């Protein structure tokens, strides 16, 4: 396993985001595995071989999303970050991005210059362009491009230059403007204005169609994410559940991988854009017994849903975990199994302490975030 030892940004002290980039991948994985095993040790029954080998992908060129701060001036824009020393650093050559994405990021710097859009200055509360957000679909190499602006003032300039950009890069399928008028370092605002007829980007993992809209969460490492979803599919299939819940379902990645035409699936996600994407996928797959609803997962589990208990429950919460209340609800529902996908092993361990009547039978680490402290964990809990 290789590592990104030649990252110039890191060597020059301009970007420290990949804090472990100087360590061999094997050493990075060993540290992550040790942390996971220590956190989950209280829940491990030595009678069962819970920890499976970690799943890894490429150490460079794997990331499908760029969040670039707009810096510099209208005549000399910089897309990247502010370095620890306060320098505006272009990150267009970041090695986490595929080569075609790097090239497009450079082109977007020229686009901003040609359009004459002044980057927003937080210290002076002046300027227009705050961020550029670029998302890449691996299935066709297509892109969604978002401009985060302070106001509507620069939209006409973007529209003026956009035809030339899209003629040069026909793989750009979705373009939008997000309005973020607040004088704070907030990534995006409430209002999204589409500049293209298309409003979603298509992705495909393991023959499952998935869709990305501007505000819907999507995994940033598609290579390893596809393996994560496939593993979930295989683990769930072992139980042949007659009904499924997918809580914190996002665009439906887990549930749609585990669904079948004769199995009722209920997916719950608070973000309405993600639910719209999940419904579209289910329709394409011909899944008539699937329902996706934009609700809070904890509230859903406490409501009328408690009358129809599923045989298997999938949870994929944000970093805060599912919380004590939902843990108690899951314990009361008593499904055959609970499949927990976590991006924070600390809150996973905390939640496991609140789920009663289950044993941990499988745990697998998925390294979606090389060179960082973060990783994804898939944990299978089986009813005692």
From Swiss-Prot:
GO-annotated biological processes: rRNA base methylation
Active site residues per record: 343
Catalysed reaction equations from the record: uridine(747) in 23S rRNA + S-adenosyl-L-methionine = 5-methyluridine(747) in 23S rRNA + S-adenosyl-L-homocysteine + H(+)
Protein keywords: 4Fe-4S, Iron, Iron-sulfur, Metal-binding, Methyltransferase, rRNA processing, S-adenosyl-L-methionine, Transferase
Residues annotated as binding S-adenosyl-L-methionine: 219, 248, 269, 316
Gene3D superfamilies: 2.40.50.1070, Vaccinia Virus protein VP39 (3.40.50.150)
One Pfam family here: tRNA_U5-meth_tr
Enzyme Commission number: 2.1.1.189
Presence of the UniProt keyword Iron in the record: yes
Signal peptide interval: none
Positions with a binding annotation for [4Fe-4S] cluster: 7, 15, 18, 94
Domain of life: Bacteria
InterPro entries, alphabetized: 23SrRNA_MeTrfase_RlmC (IPR011825), MeTrfase_TrmA_AS (IPR030390), MeTrfase_TrmA_CS (IPR030391), SAM-dependent_MTases_sf (IPR029063), U5_MeTrfase_fam (IPR010280)
Molecular-function GO terms, alphabetical: 4 iron, 4 sulfur cluster binding; iron ion binding; rRNA (uridine-C5-)-methyltransferase activity
Protein function: Catalyzes the formation of 5-methyl-uridine at position 747 (m5U747) in 23S rRNA.
Family: Belongs to the class I-like SAM-binding methyltransferase superfamily. RNA M5U methyltransferase family. RlmC subfamily.
PANTHER family the UniProt entry points to: RNA M5U METHYLTRANSFERASE, TRNA (URACIL(54)-C(5))-METHYLTRANSFERASE
NCBIfam families with a match to the protein in the record: meth_trns_rumB
Protein name in the entry: 23S rRNA (uracil(747)-C(5))-methyltransferase RlmC
Origin species: Shewanella sp. (strain MR-4)
